């Protein structure tokens, strides 16, 4: 086994938490069950890694085997990357073709290898009619960098592909070309939608978030819940509070639905506007360049946070459509300009 392959496998195994190690190694299916039984997983991790590397050397693991292990690790730790969404489209009058996974993989790989002398492309199919693709980029003069790959998840017979954000922006056009041609589409555009949660992005673009996420029952009338109201409070005020809370709940449910929201961590709004003033000689009014403003909302679970604002009394209901339209618009990066 090549030293670079051994080092690659070693680094990948070291990233894997011990409580996930046997699960990931079994999913890798490179080492046999008998070989794994010879490993004492209760000893120090460094010793476990050395034993596993020795077993891989005995089986002469290749760079393809090591890349497959890395894909499996990333499938378990998708949230370590920020994922972007690309949408493809057919040309006018083009029919939907039958999808052939083998043909797709061969075509995708050939396009990249023709353009770049040094590139490693690996695939792993999943049960959801999806294929995970790992691309280690090189150049005409340098070998592929296995430690800064791009990951792509493509769902067959759909126009959507999800890619991990990469600092190698120069390769984005080539990646788009390979996806478009291999999937038999005509063109590709990057959507203004990003998140660390791949399943949530998938739910948004496929409009599955009101089906795939568990629903919860909140049909209990507000009168039957504890509103935290003082029992000595005027009955008219109590009634007014109940009516207002019911109104807020109704609007919130109409806006967000009665189910958990897809998980996004941020929404960004870029505003460009000309300053308008009725005063003559205003310095800002004479300014040719538009005023630019950037607003970013962030939260571990942004949509659920927005959903809770009005019921918590932090914001008035309904919220601004710019905040509530994120799932339907399928975007969390907005550019707002003067009409």
Swiss-Prot record:
<keyword id="KW-0597">Phosphoprotein</keyword>
<feature type="modified residue" description="Phosphoserine">
    <location>
        <position position="235"/>
    </location>
</feature>
<dbReference type="GO" id="GO:0000939">
    <property type="term" value="C:inner kinetochore"/>
</dbReference>
<feature type="modified residue" description="Phosphoserine">
    <location>
        <position position="282"/>
    </location>
</feature>
<dbReference type="GO" id="GO:0005829">
    <property type="term" value="C:cytosol"/>
</dbReference>
<dbReference type="GO" id="GO:0005654">
    <property type="term" value="C:nucleoplasm"/>
</dbReference>
<comment type="function">
    <text>Component of the CENPA-NAC (nucleosome-associated) complex, a complex that plays a central role in assembly of kinetochore proteins, mitotic progression and chromosome segregation. The CENPA-NAC complex recruits the CENPA-CAD (nucleosome distal) complex and may be involved in incorporation of newly synthesized CENPA into centromeres. CENPN is the first protein to bind specifically to CENPA nucleosomes and the direct binding of CENPA nucleosomes by CENPN is required for centromere assembly. Required for chromosome congression and efficiently align the chromosomes on a metaphase plate.</text>
</comment>
<dbReference type="GO" id="GO:0007059">
    <property type="term" value="P:chromosome segregation"/>
</dbReference>
<protein>
    <recommendedName>
        <fullName>Centromere protein N</fullName>
    </recommendedName>
</protein>
<dbReference type="GO" id="GO:0034080">
    <property type="term" value="P:CENP-A containing chromatin assembly"/>
</dbReference>
<keyword id="KW-0137">Centromere</keyword>
<feature type="modified residue" description="Phosphoserine">
    <location>
        <position position="226"/>
    </location>
</feature>
<dbReference type="Pfam" id="PF05238">
    <property type="entry name" value="CENP-N"/>
</dbReference>
<comment type="subunit">
    <text>Component of the CENPA-NAC complex, at least composed of CENPA, CENPC, CENPH, CENPM, CENPN, CENPT and CENPU. The CENPA-NAC complex interacts with the CENPA-CAD complex, composed of CENPI, CENPK, CENPL, CENPO, CENPP, CENPQ, CENPR and CENPS. Interacts directly with CENPA. Identified in a centromere complex containing histones H2A, H2B and H4, and at least CENPA, CENPB, CENPC, CENPT, CENPN, HJURP, SUPT16H, SSRP1 and RSF1.</text>
</comment>
<comment type="similarity">
    <text>Belongs to the CENP-N/CHL4 family.</text>
</comment>
<dbReference type="InterPro" id="IPR007902">
    <property type="entry name" value="Chl4/mis15/CENP-N"/>
</dbReference>
<keyword id="KW-0539">Nucleus</keyword>
<keyword id="KW-0158">Chromosome</keyword>
<dbReference type="InterPro" id="IPR052011">
    <property type="entry name" value="CENP-NAC/CAD_complex"/>
</dbReference>
<dbReference type="GO" id="GO:0005634">
    <property type="term" value="C:nucleus"/>
</dbReference>
<keyword id="KW-0995">Kinetochore</keyword>
């Amino acid at each position: 086994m090549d030293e670079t392959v051994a080092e690659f496998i070693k680094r990948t195994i070291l990233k894997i938490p011990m409580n996930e190690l046997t699960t990931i190694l079994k999913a890798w299916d490179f080492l046999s069950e008998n070989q794994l039984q010879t490993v004492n997983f209760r000893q120090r991790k460094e010793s476990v890694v050395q034993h596993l590397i020795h077993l891989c050397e005995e089986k002469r693991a290749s760079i393809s085997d090591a890349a497959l292990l890395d894909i499996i690790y990333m499938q378990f730790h998708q949230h370590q990357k920020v994922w972007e969404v690309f949408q493809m489209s057919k040309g006018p009058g083009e029919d939907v073709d039958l999808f052939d996974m083998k043909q797709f993989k061969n075509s995708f790989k050939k396009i990249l290898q023709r353009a770049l002398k040094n590139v490693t492309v690996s695939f792993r199919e999943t049960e959801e009619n999806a294929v995970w693709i790992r691309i280690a980029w090189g150049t005409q003069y340098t070998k592929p960098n296995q430690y800064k790959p791009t990951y792509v998840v493509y769902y067959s017979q759909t126009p959507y592909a999800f890619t991990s954000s990469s600092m190698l922006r120069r390769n984005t056009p080539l990646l788009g070309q390979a996806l478009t041609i291999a999937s038999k589409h005509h063109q590709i555009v990057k959507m203004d939608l990003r998140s660390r949660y791949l399943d949530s992005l998938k739910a948004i673009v496929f409009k599955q978030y009101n089906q795939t996420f568990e629903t919860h029952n909140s049909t209990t009338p507000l009168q039957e819940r504890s509103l935290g109201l003082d029992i000595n409070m005027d009955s008219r005020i109590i009634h007014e509070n109940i009516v207002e809370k019911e109104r807020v709940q109704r609007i919130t449910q109409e806006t967000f639905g009665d189910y958990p929201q897809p998980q996004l961590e941020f929404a960004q709004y870029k505003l460009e506007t000309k300053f308008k003033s009725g005063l003559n000689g205003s310095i800002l009014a004479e300014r040719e360049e538009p005023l630019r403003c950037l607003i970013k909302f962030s939260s571990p679970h942004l949509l659920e946070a927005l959903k809770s604002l009005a019921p918590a009394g932090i914001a008035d209901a309904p919220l601004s459509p710019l905040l509530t339209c994120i799932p339907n618009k399928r975007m969390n990066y907005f550019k707002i300009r003067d009409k």
